[in-house]
Curated annotation (Swiss-Prot):
Induction comment: By SHH.
Encoding gene (name): Olig1
Function comment: Promotes formation and maturation of oligodendrocytes, especially within the brain. Cooperates with OLIG2 to establish the pMN domain of the embryonic neural tube.
Name by which UniProt lists this protein: Oligodendrocyte transcription factor 1
GO BP terms, alphabetized: neuron fate commitment; oligodendrocyte development; regulation of DNA-templated transcription
Species of provenance: Mus musculus (Mouse)
Domain bHLH positions: 94-153
Chief subcellular location: nucleus
Amino acid sequence: MYYAISQARVNAAPATMLRPQRPGDVQLGASLYELVGYRQPPISSSSSSSSSTASLLPKPAREKAEAPLAEPRGPAPESGGARADAKEEQQQQQLRRKINSRERKRMQDLNLAMDALREVILPYSAAHCQGAPGRKLSKIATLLLARNYILLLGSSLQELRRALGDGAGPAAPRLLLAGLPLLAAAPGSVLLAPGAVGPPETLRPTKYLSLALDEPPCGQFSLPAGGAGSPGLCSCAVCKFPHLVPAGLGLAAVQAQFSK
């Protein structure tokens, strides 16, 4: 009798396990496993849920779910790239500061040079005298005024030489030779400095004529390595400093040319 009941339980266990269980039904297979002594090993809920979810998902979806776990390893190269970008930006800022400082210094030097040129040119500028006293000339106007002033000085020098050559007689060659070194020796004090130009009577040809007549004639000394046709050195008081006098422009040659 007992053997028949137990055999019926064993035969009915698979059917009971396969059949959906209802509330209130007793699972016969569990009591059979307890009688035999079999116990199922404990499984954590998280691992069981993840394994069951992973087993239910298809293979591509499983790979996508595992991919985000490997992403946190990427911040190290990203931080290095950000550091390199910050360093490059800092270098560009330093280079920009150097360029700006160099350009600022260049403009300051240009402004100082223009101010110095205005101090020399403006006393001789009629436009500046007619204009407002506090008005400052632009850079282009200052350069154009300086160009015209230099041309005026050159023409004045040529007129002075022509006047001295026409009315000085035999002393004209000496004045022609000595005129350029005299005016070129100190251009700042003779021609450019404000107030250095004296009254008109001090610039008359008679002053230079008397100076040329009082001084001894130009002495030409041959250079040590030169021959008969080599240039000589003029060291007279009119010339103020020694300079080369070519043989073709000696005193005798110039006098002969003007006597024709």
